[in-house]
Swiss-Prot record:
Matches recorded under InterPro entries: MFS_dom, MFS_sugar_transport-like, MFS_trans_sf
Compartments, as annotated in UniProt: Membrane
Organism whose genome encodes this protein: Xenopus tropicalis (Western clawed frog)
Protein name: Solute carrier family 22 member 15-like
TM annotation in the entry: 22-42, 90-110, 117-137, 141-161, 178-198, 203-223, 286-306, 315-335, 345-365, 374-394, 406-426, 435-455
Function: Probably transports organic cations.
UniProtKB keywords: Glycoprotein, Ion transport, Membrane, Transmembrane, Transmembrane helix, Transport
Membrane topology: Multi-pass membrane protein
Amino acid sequence: MDLDEAFLYIGEFGCCQKRLTAFLTLLQVYVACQSMLIVLVGAVPEYLIDNEDISASKEEYTKHLHDTNNFTSIVSEWHLIKNEAYKVNLASSLFFAGLLIGNILFGPLSDKLGRRPVYLSGLFFDITFGYCTALAPSYEVFAVSRFFVGIMNGGMALVSFVLTQEYVGKSYWALTGSLTNLIFAVGIAFYALLGFYIRNWRTLAFVANSPGIFFFLLSFLLPESPRWLYSHGYTTEAEGVLQSMAVGNGVERPVVKLKSCPGTSSKSAHSVFDLVKYGVLRWRTILLMYIWYVCSLVYYGLTLNAGELKGNLYLNVALYGLVEVPAFPLCLYFIEKSWSGRRKATAGFLGFAGFACIFTIFLPETNGDLLNPTVLALFGKLSVSAAFNVVYIYTSELYPTVVRNAGLGVCAMACRFGGILSPFIPTMKSLNPSMPFVAFGISGISAGILSLLLPETRNKPIAESIEDLQSPAYQLLSRGNEVLAST
């Protein structure tokens, strides 16, 4: 039997896989806390300077500065105000730069060395640098530690997402992918709750990082991905993992015998360069990189430019996460419908987000409560969050197992560029106040249109090797499944 048949035999989403999925999705709470750390740790407290005529030196400001808040942050500890205020954004940018590097490094590494060892290494160093952040004696150490947390957090989260997918049968990839992103959104709200009760930034950073130890110790119980083992020629080891899953799923006396995977006899190792070498992968990668880039650009663009949320800091952070929650059931509904699927759902959600940006141009200066820039931002963010969720699942299905993490890593790299560039788009306001929203809108709509050039993956078999994509048997099976699903 091949791997998809083996999953049907042992159970695509049995008790064993449910436990593995629950563990890896709960890990996203830790990932979210690390990702959102700077929002509260770098919050600017209200302060008074009793003598505005003093010199602009940091030492003089310190003497005349009075904090009026009941929380601490790196701003209050190291007096990052006035000429030093840029350092908060710099630390945030360093974290995103780390995410960029982590996505580039960890994808190919896990495709070559295996999912499990790369995931465990990333989580270990993520925890280590997380404690360096909490105990940083100076801003410089804090900023550098955030950079390395970004590398480890981004890379480890990418590999854990792929593991979540590869532990289950293909028909459950949409569910497990959506659960991963849903728990990340809930994790943002959980971090806001932590911040509400823990007002000292060092204690908050320490507590937010500590659950990582629990996840790290339990992660040693995780098996290697059977899909990675099978695609790299470790057929016996893959059979062993699948038989253990079968026992955990309650299958009596399971016997799993896999046939050889096409393409594993090749002596050359697969790498990120395969994404350029093969035409079918090259064009998919170009399209997906642009779509991921736009998802990030529009996501952060709507957040930063469609009106600032007023009110309680902790409530706003919680809303920032919770507004994404409805996106996931919407995503699950649309991607499993024959008239929508992955491709049209991606196009629709991106198009909606793009039109939300364009529509902002026509809002009057004084808006009612029902329709204003903040409400439009929340609806747009809901839509682009759904697009992000679909794209994660869609990308996993478009790449063969041997280069799946490399493909996801390259796409995630493009995503980080979108996040880094989005704050600079508002400078276009100097040309015309509507220009930033026009840029975001055109980007979203264009990405939605281009996504229609990608093949649909709903109810199609997962390619294990690059040769599968070019195999007539694979293409025939794909068409057969598509016809069967439409009847």
